């Protein structure tokens, strides 16, 4: 995609960190953006920053837990309505949380929630927005995995199973889509991003979704949030 000008991008996890930076860079490139997050106040800050960079693009915000299919489908419907379009050009599956370190010792509900956000969030959003991507003249799906998507460890003595398993799934899904798009939707592209450890505010969203405050997280959990 040579230019983002007048395109429509969807960014999950747009309230903070890499998601916020994506929104700002897209706005700077004259791209209209719809973002979701679980914390509306963070999206308000992102919107203020984006509109100060470029007041001429359309930025919309939507509260959505990407691990819940019904919320994702409502997010899609609201995006298309507010952007007044039946298509989008870019989908950035960026949202994620940490936690659920041990398959043996971690709380089952927490383990499954982390996996759901980090994997099913990518799947549900890709599924929900696929028709809108296909309807575009040129579309691109960008999935965020992690260095832990090919190395499932933070080091000796630190279990990292739920997050790593989900990020491996994102990597495999993205690689499989390369051929699927080539055969069935050649005007679409897919990219995989595998960042290392980044100082984002993932702990805040993790706490909201898992019902924990940052100060309630143990030392290992805090280490996971720094990615």
Positions of predicted regions on the chain:
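Canonical Rossmann dinucleotide-binding motif of NAD(H)/NADP(H)-dependent dehydrogenases/reductases
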Residues: 2-33
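Conserved glycine-rich Rossmann-like NAD(P)H-binding loop of the short-chain dehydrogenase/reductase
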Residues: 31-45
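The beta1-alpha1 cofactor-binding region of Rossmann-like NAD(H)/NADP(H)-dependent oxidoreductases
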Residues: 40-41, 63-74, 108
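Substrate-binding pocket helix/loop in short-chain dehydrogenase/reductase
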Residues: 102-103, 110-112
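A short, exposed helix-loop element centered on a Lys and neighboring polar residues
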Residues: 126-127
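Residue(s) in the substrate-gating loop at a strand-loop-helix junction
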Residues: 146
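SDR active-site lid
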Residues: 183-227
């Amino acid at each position: 995609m040579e230019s983002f000008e007048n395109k429509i991008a969807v960014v999950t996890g747009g309230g903070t960190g890499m998601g916020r930076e994506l929104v700002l860079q897209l706005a700077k490139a004259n791209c209209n953006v719809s973002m979701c997050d679980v914390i509306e106040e963070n999206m308000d800050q992102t919107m203020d920053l984006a509109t100060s960079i470029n007041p001429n693009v359309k930025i919309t915000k939507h509260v959505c837990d990407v691990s819940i299919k019904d919320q994702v489908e409502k997010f899609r419907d609201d995006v298309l309505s507010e952007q007044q379009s039946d298509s989008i050009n870019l989908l950035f599956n960026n949202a994620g949380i940490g936690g659920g370190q041990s398959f043996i010792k971690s709380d089952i509900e927490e383990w499954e929630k982390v996996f759901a956000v980090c994997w099913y969030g990518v799947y549900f959003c890709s599924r929900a927005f696929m028709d809108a991507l296909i309807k575009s003249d040129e579309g691109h799906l960008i999935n965020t995995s992690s260095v832990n998507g090919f190395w499932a460890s933070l080091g000796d003595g630190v279990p990292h199973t739920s997050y790593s398993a989900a990020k491996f799934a994102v990597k495999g899904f993205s690689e499989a889509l390369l051929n699927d798009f080539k055969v069935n939707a050649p005007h679409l592209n897919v990219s995989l991003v595998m960042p290392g450890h980044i100082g984002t505010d993932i702990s805040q969203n993790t706490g909201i979704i898992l019902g924990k405050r940052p100060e309630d997280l143990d030392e290992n959990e805090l280490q996971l949030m720094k990615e």
